[in-house]
Amino acid sequence: MKFERVEDLKEYLTQQCFTDTVVLESPSYISAVVGISTDGRLIYSRDLMVRHLCEQDGMTEQEADEFIDFNTEGALPNMGEKAPIIMEDL
């Protein structure tokens, strides 16, 4: 299932009783959501996150990669038990 807007994803999560799931919003990476874990954590594809930043914000792949390293992955420890999972694509 793909979502166009963060609000639609949040509504779906609420309907599925995942009310405490952390959703990345700034940037949303909505196009990078690939699933949800059994413990209610959203799973994002790192490759799709990079692509999202390149397409939406005009970053180069290197800039997007560095942005994700510092700003997104660096913030995960502060997001609690339901912090998203960033999956490395094989």
Indicate residue ranges for each PLM-predicted region.
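C-terminal alpha-helical interaction appendages
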Residues: 2-90
